[in-house]
Amino acid sequence: MKLLSILFIFVSSYSFCLAAPATDKVNDLPGLTFTPDFFHYSGYLRAWTDKYLHYWLTESSRAPTQDPLVLWLNGGPGCSSLDGLIEELGPFHVKDFGNSIYYNEYAWNKFANVLFLESPAGVGYSYSTNFNLTVSDDEVSLHNYMALLDFLSKFPEYKGRDFWITGESYAGVYIPTLAVRILNDKKNFPNFKGVAIGNGALNFPNNYNTMVPFYYYHALVRDDLYNDIARNCCNNNIGTCDIYSKFFDPNCRDKVINALDGTNELNMYNLYDVCYYNPTTNLKKAFIERQMRIAVGLPARKHNAATTVPLCAQTNNTHVYLNRADVRKSLHIPSSLPAWEECSDQVGKNYVVTHFNVIPEFQTMIAAGIKILVYNGDVDTACNSIMNQQFLTSLNLTVLGEQEKVNEAWHYSGQTGTAVAGFQTKFAGNVDFLTVRGSGHFVPEDKPKESQQMIFNFINNKDYSTPIQL
């Protein structure tokens, strides 16, 4: 009997060592209006000697011990991935002025274990013990990699699991630079399968090269201004013009800025967004735009006070909810930390951009044979679809299918039958480019059903038009 008792203690201890950390488990999330059929965890991962990144893991509601691990990163640089969780692809969405949590039926954790990581230190609930928040692209990729190693030590059951990295916006830099590090660590990540980048900042200068024609063909720039830029700045060919360089040409600078400021009265993250505006709403989206322009040395746009960020983006609800004392306690957030903010001005202002173009990282990923999905909402102007299509074309990959054919439609199953979700181009090297019709910068927020189907089919190697039942 004594031997059996000792054996039981040993087995129990061994099982505990292989299990998720009980101290990080979220047992009571305030405001829930449903009972989750999955476990979720919130805590900290050590990213460097003085840097600790907050994570929130939402395990799969389908088969958590078998489904893949999917990392999600928001961009900025300097914005929190909890926005991705609460406003986009996570299972918990906030309403009623931060008082209630309702279930997102299009959550990605219906088929994957989704890890939301607030990066870099200083963003959201993440922190640095020495208060130095100046980081570069390469340092962020290193810190994210080290945080993932710490995650595997906390959750050893995920070691060897199929692993995917996803995200949007400035994560177009975070993801490729992190992927290169992961590819060099087969020991800890033997089943790294691929990446999915939404509306990514893959080539900063070309984003601005493509914005003037994008605006023009959306009837936002007058013929006389467009023709003036073409004639006097672009040798009569805007299609191949390095418009970005014209920002530094005194004869063209004002013309180009006037063209790009044509959307001042619109939501540049979704040109067709219809919403009442509230000047008191948190300025996350204005922050992202400012960071993108600062990164390439452009002046910040001027916004009218009443047209900054739409209230219906739910950002204010998120901010209110995550700063509730009972919510912070449930998520195991130290009381000594300051209030949660969607985007950190301090991180943004001190951020050092070193990767203006991620072609080398893409070439490394392609050579390694992992799957790559680049997707874009087609009415986003912050990181527009033409920029990313041209970025992939610059890789000189073979287009699969009929060379002269227009991009092929992909479909989703809607309430009234099958509908066009967007268009797709497939390249040799396991590279896919998809547009999401009618979506802006935040695809899982604007088109949740389409994005869920797209990602499910991507990681399961199915045709993007395949209907899903979850």
Swiss-Prot record:
Residues 1-19 form the signal peptide. The active site is at S169, D380, H441. This is Serine carboxypeptidase ctsa-4.1. One of its GO terms (biological process) is proteolysis. It catalyses: Release of a C-terminal amino acid with broad specificity. It comes from Caenorhabditis elegans. InterPro entries: AB_hydrolase_fold, Peptidase_S10, Ser_caboxypep_his_AS, Ser_caboxypep_ser_AS. One of its GO terms (molecular function) is serine-type carboxypeptidase activity. Glycans are attached at N132, N316, N396. Its EC number is 3.4.16.5. Keywords: Carboxypeptidase, Glycoprotein, Hydrolase, Protease, Signal. Belongs to the peptidase S10 family. It is an enzyme of class 3 (hydrolase).
